[in-house]
Amino acid sequence: MATRAEPLAAAGAVGGREGQFVLVEWSDPGGLTNRERPIAGLHVHHSDDEAWYVLEGTLGFRVGDDEVEAGPGAAVFVPRGTPHSFWNAGAGPARYVLVMPPRLKELVEALHAPGAGDFAAIFREHASELL
């Protein structure tokens, strides 16, 4: 069983030079994350928007001061500059598509790289910040 959310497939980049974004399908096995142990802790992207589309299970989100749960077929959009975190809100597995610009895909890859060290520095390198 995985100890963190795992990428399942990447659809690659879509869009033109100015509006390019990446779709990546992820899964979380359930039982490992929750509000206190999120898939991604509270952070902010200063220059990039981000969105999720839930395929299976239930994800919980903190977006700014609000919390919401999203089930299959639901989408959550987080505009740049908005603090956010997310977690598997159910007991079972969750599958979702993360929609993000290439810079955020590079951030996720850097955070999951073997031997990734200073997470705060990695976030800063990608116009983002851990809170």
Labelled PLM ranges:
Residues A2-L42, D48-D49:
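A short glycine-rich, His/Asp/Glu-containing loop-to-beta-strand
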Residues G19, D65-P83:
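Short acidic-glycine-tyrosine-enriched beta hairpin
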Residues E25-S27, V44-F61, V99:
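Short, conserved beta-strand element in jelly-roll/cupin
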Residues S47, V54, G71, P79-G81, ...:
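A short, compositionally biased micro-patch
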Residues A51, T58-G60, E67, P83, ...:
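Structural motif
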Residues F61-R62, V78, H84-G90, R95-L98:
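Short beta-strand His + acidic residue motifs that chelate non-heme Fe in jelly-roll/DSBH
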Residues V63-G64, P72, W87-N88, V108:
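Short glycine-/acidic-enriched loop or helix-start segments at secondary-structure transitions
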Residues A89-L131:
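Double-stranded beta-helix
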